[in-house]
């Protein structure tokens, strides 16, 4: 199960498609892709 927008994470692979893990805040943010 992937993490949605602003979900807690440690790495990009934990986030849903088109999201990336922000290294400082450790939550999933949009990676700019569609």
Curated annotation (Swiss-Prot):
Its main location: secreted. Disulfide bonds join 2-16, 9-21, 15-28. It is found in: Secreted. The modification Phenylalanine amide is found at residue 34. Keywords: Amidation, Disulfide bond, Ion channel impairing toxin, Knottin, Neurotoxin, Secreted, Toxin. GO terms for cellular component: extracellular region. GO terms for molecular function: ion channel inhibitor activity; toxin activity. Negative results: does not affect TRPV2, TRPV3, TRPV4, TRPA1, TRPM8, Kv1.2/KCNA2, Kv2.1/KCNB1 and Kv4.2/KCND2 potassium channels. Selectively activates mammalian TRPV1, or capsaicin receptor, a non-selective cation channel expressed by sensory neurons of the pain pathway. Is more potent than VaTx1 and VaTx2. Interacts with distinct regions of the channel than capsaicin, since it only acts on the extracellular face of the channel, and capsaicin binds to the cytosolic side. Also activates avian TRPV1, which is insensitive to capsaicin. In mice, elicits pain-related behaviors, such as licking and flinching of the affected limb. The paw of toxin-injected mice shows substantial edema. This is Tau-theraphotoxin-Pc1c. It comes from Psalmopoeus cambridgei.
